[in-house]
Amino acid sequence: MSSSVSSKTRYWVLALAAIVLDQWSKWAVLSSFQYRERVNVIPSFFDLTLVYNPGAAFSFLADQGGWQKYFFLVLAVAVSAYLVRAILRDEFATLGKTGAAMIIGGALGNVIDRLIHGHVVDFLLFYWQNWFYPAFNIADSFICVGAVLAVLDNIVHRKTQEEKY
């Protein structure tokens, strides 16, 4: 078991790095911006801003009555626990474990926000003319990239399994 745990250290380091990067970036924005303040980074395309999101990634369910805070808190912890178990049991190949670690780090980064602030801190705002993508944060990015890696791992693994038969 100890060799199994030590071989997985890189995934725990990745998850921790995601949490640290996410929390540091949010601290920097909270320390430097007023609520809804915007600073243009790339004209007509990308701003830094400070907004609060009581919903999920990309403001999903943000306009609900408050129940979603607890729902997404429990969901993030449950998904993270499942993914930790899956990594420990080698249920994924390397790409899937990397994706799972990224999802864990992103999910727990947003859990920390919900516990400390009662909402998630978002600050990355992409737009084009009158079209705005919902503001998001580093944790959301880790979750999305991790999900893509997990899906790719599943596709590759499934194809490999089919080739065996």
From Swiss-Prot:
Q: What is its EC number?
A: 3.4.23.36
Pfam families found in the cross-reference section? Peptidase_A8 (PF01252)
Q: Its biological function? A: This protein specifically catalyzes the removal of signal peptides from prolipoproteins.
Native organism is Neisseria meningitidis serogroup B (strain ATCC BAA-335 / MC58)
Task: Give the family, as the similarity comment puts it.
Answer: Belongs to the peptidase A8 family.
Q: Which GO terms describe its biological process?
A: proteolysis
The residues responsible for catalysis, as annotated, are D122, D140
- Which gene does this sequence derive from? lspA
- Write down the InterPro entries for this protein, in alphabetical order: Peptidase_A8
What does the entry list under GO cellular component?
A: plasma membrane
**Name of the protein in its database record:** Lipoprotein signal peptidase
Q: Does the keyword Transmembrane helix apply?
A: yes
The source's domain of life comes to: Bacteria
Which reaction is this enzyme known to catalyze? Answer: Release of signal peptides from bacterial membrane prolipoproteins. Hydrolyzes -Xaa-Yaa-Zaa-|-(S,diacylglyceryl)Cys-, in which Xaa is hydrophobic (preferably Leu), and Yaa (Ala or Ser) and Zaa (Gly or Ala) have small, neutral side chains
Q: Where are the transmembrane segments?
A: 11-31, 41-61, 64-84, 92-112, 132-152
